[in-house]
């Protein structure tokens, strides 16, 4: 029976929540944890070890070393610069490129040949940075993309229609950020368009605007109150890791590298993607409305502009 090993880089709010979920579900045989704060990594390892008796399967959790990368199936990168007050996710770019370039080079030099999974913001651009620095094939690098935004969209719609969130299909695509696109043309419950399920006197545009704005804004609202968002995104990462390790063939809206899909090329962006043992196996092209497609292209233009800035920073470093 195949043994599964992951390395987690960054044991902050997101990383530790992810690690706890991995232990609770017993998804892997071994998990190595690396953090710039070695005492924090050590303390998390001890704490997680004491949780293993309650997990579904035993996970060997230990402090990671350079040697751990070589035989890992997946490296999950939760390391990130801190988001300063008033900054957007995209403003994190320069600091995180400075962190990522030497880190990715070292991981690749170790002989690692598995999959990179990351939520670090700006996640679409950082996914591109990992691809450029590692020179790995596109399927081996998966950013969390708009998976969390999609979950938020599902949740808000589920409250409106009094159904479980996982019974709502409502994709968010594009940038994980302000230019994200709510795909109302494909939002469904039990196969029925959600807009058709509303009372006949509903102001549809007002309803759509309200839900879309709440979906975009809620991350900032959470951040203002607790300084981070970590529970939803950590479970998104768990779902991605599980899909790769166990060939789940699930579809998630993650940061994938498009090469012609949706009329876009050479950009990491949130799109529906089949995830299995091949990583980001293939992109699903939804039939978007003209407005949605235009919004997606606008979102891609924003990401591409920052990708060019990332390229300039990398060129100076390498």
From Swiss-Prot:
PANTHER family, per the entry: L-2-HYDROXYCARBOXYLATE DEHYDROGENASE (NAD(P)(+)), L-LACTATE DEHYDROGENASE
Residue numbers binding NAD(+): 14, 35, 40, 66, 144
Catalytic activities: (S)-lactate + NAD(+) = pyruvate + NADH + H(+)
Keyword Ribonucleoprotein in annotation: no
Compartments reported by the entry: Cytoplasm
Similarity annotation: Belongs to the LDH/MDH superfamily. LDH family.
Main localization, broad class: cytoplasm
Function (record text): Catalyzes the conversion of lactate to pyruvate.
Modified residues (Phosphotyrosine): 220
Taxonomic classification: Bacteria, Bacillati, Bacillota, Bacilli, Bacillales
GO annotation, biological process: glycolytic process; lactate metabolic process
Gene, per the UniProt record: ldh
GO MF term list: L-lactate dehydrogenase activity
Subunit and interaction comment: Homotetramer.
Native species: Staphylococcus haemolyticus (strain JCSC1435)
UniProt key word S-adenosyl-L-methionine: no
NCBIfam families in the record: L-LDH-NAD, PRK00066.1
Gene Ontology terms: cellular component: cytoplasm
Entry annotation: catalytic residues: 176 (proton acceptor)
EC number(s) given by UniProt: 1.1.1.27
Protein keywords: Cytoplasm, NAD, Oxidoreductase, Phosphoprotein
Pathway: Fermentation; pyruvate fermentation to lactate; (S)-lactate from pyruvate: step 1/1
Protein name: L-lactate dehydrogenase
């Amino acid at each position: 029976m195949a043994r599964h090993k992951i390395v987690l880089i960054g044991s902050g709010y997101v990383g530790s929540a992810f690690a706890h979920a991995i232990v609770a579900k017993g998804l892997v045989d071994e998990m190595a944890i690396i953090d710039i704060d070695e005492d924090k990594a050590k303390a998390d390892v001890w704490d997680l070890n004491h949780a293993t008796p309650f997990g579904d399967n035993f996970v060997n959790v230990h402090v990671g070393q350079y040697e751990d990368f070589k035989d890992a199936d997946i490296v999950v990168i939760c390391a990130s610069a801190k988001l300063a007050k008033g900054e957007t996710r995209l403003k994190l770019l320069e600091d995180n490129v400075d962190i990522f370039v030497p880190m990715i080079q070292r991981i690749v030099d170790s002989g690692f040949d598995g999959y990179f999974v990351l939520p670090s913001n700006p996640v679409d651009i950082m996914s591109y940075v990992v691809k450029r620095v590692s020179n790995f094939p596109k399927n081996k690098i998966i950013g969390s993309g708009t998976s969390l935004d999609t979950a938020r969209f599902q949740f808000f719609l589920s409250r409106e229609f009094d159904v479980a969130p996982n019974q709502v299909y409502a994709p968010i695509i594009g940038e994980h950020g302000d230019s994200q696109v709510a795909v109302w043309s494909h939002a469904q419950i039990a196969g029925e368009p959600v807009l058709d399920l509303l009372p006949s006197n509903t102001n549809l545009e007002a309803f759509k605007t309200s839900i879309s704005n709440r979906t975009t804004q809620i991350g900032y609202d959470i951040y203002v109150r607790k300084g981070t968002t970590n529970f939803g995104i950590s479970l998104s990462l768990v779902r991605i890791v599980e899909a790769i390790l166990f060939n789940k063939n699930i579809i998630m809206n993650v940061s994938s590298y498009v090469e012609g899909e949706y009329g876009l090329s050479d950009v990491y962006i949130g799109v529906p993607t089949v995830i299995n043992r091949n990583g980001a196996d293939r992109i699903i092209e939804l039939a978007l409305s003209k407005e949605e497609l235009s919004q997606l292209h606008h979102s891609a233009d924003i990401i591409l502009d920052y990708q060019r800035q990332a390229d300039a920073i990398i060129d100076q470093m390498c």
